[in-house]
Amino acid sequence: MKKQAELYRGKAKTVYSTDNPDLLVLEFRNDTSAGDGARIEQFDRKGMVNNKFNHFIMSKLAEAGIPTQMEALLSDTECLVKKLDMVPVECVVRNRAAGSLVKRLGIEEGIELNPPLFDLFLKNDAMHDPMVNDSYCETFGWVSKENLARMRELTYKANDVLKKLFDDAGLILVDFKLEFGLFKGEVVLGDEFSPDGSRLWDKNTLDKMDKDRFRQSLGGLIEAYEEVAHRLGVKLD
């Protein structure tokens, strides 16, 4: 497998083609963004931590029967993934109230949500990822009813797997987002799972161990990411 041209450069990752039309190289950079890319800073080791963290989580989800795009870890900051036809809608599961939900409904941060909430957002930075629903997806042809149902099913299944994984590590999985795509007609989990796209709190102190440390200028971002990885048993070095 040979890495070729840069195809896409996002806020924190770069995608490259390979000599295999079904495979891509996903590179995790040290960039960290907030406000849909309005604020960007670089943190040493972040690309490495997120790459290895993502590979670890995707492996756990694959073991649980969730199809993922992950193929192999290539280096400290790169992994080999299937080339997906990405769905332009992301799935969010909320186990506790935080972030935009608190602002939107005026509820207390941290209250438990039982059953968990499931939200859909259109992936569009310029419009700040507006919330949408099943009806929008059908009307605008973003994803079929069948594939959306499968995305919802896999998201809830991932939540069951990951809640226990993090709980066993002394962490609360507050919420997270997942992105899906199609590979040869099958719904497959793509993009990444890392503290960039999830909220993780310490069970005892409720300290935030995710990108909210950057969003809210709390400091200690990489230290928190590495602590989460350490608790899970992710091998970083």
Swiss-Prot record:
GO terms classed as biological process: 'de novo' IMP biosynthetic process; cobalamin biosynthetic process
Gene: purC
Keyword Nucleotide-binding among UniProt keywords: yes
EC number from the UniProt entry: 6.3.2.6
PANTHER family reported for this sequence: MULTIFUNCTIONAL PROTEIN ADE2, SI:DKEY-6E2.2
Pathway: Purine metabolism; IMP biosynthesis via de novo pathway; 5-amino-1-(5-phospho-D-ribosyl)imidazole-4-carboxamide from 5-amino-1-(5-phospho-D-ribosyl)imidazole-4-carboxylate: step 1/2
Keyword ATP-binding assigned: yes
Similarity annotation: Belongs to the SAICAR synthetase family.
UniProt source species: Klebsiella pneumoniae subsp. pneumoniae (strain ATCC 700721 / MGH 78578)
Keywords: ATP-binding, Ligase, Nucleotide-binding, Purine biosynthesis
One Gene Ontology cellular component annotation held by this UniProt entry: cytosol
A Pfam family matched in the record: SAICAR_synt
Catalytic activity: 5-amino-1-(5-phospho-D-ribosyl)imidazole-4-carboxylate + L-aspartate + ATP = (2S)-2-[5-amino-1-(5-phospho-beta-D-ribosyl)imidazole-4-carboxamido]succinate + ADP + phosphate + 2 H(+)
PROSITE patterns: SAICAR_SYNTHETASE_1, SAICAR_SYNTHETASE_2
GO molecular-function terms, A-Z: ATP binding; phosphoribosylaminoimidazolesuccinocarboxamide synthase activity
UniProt-recorded name of the protein: Phosphoribosylaminoimidazole-succinocarboxamide synthase
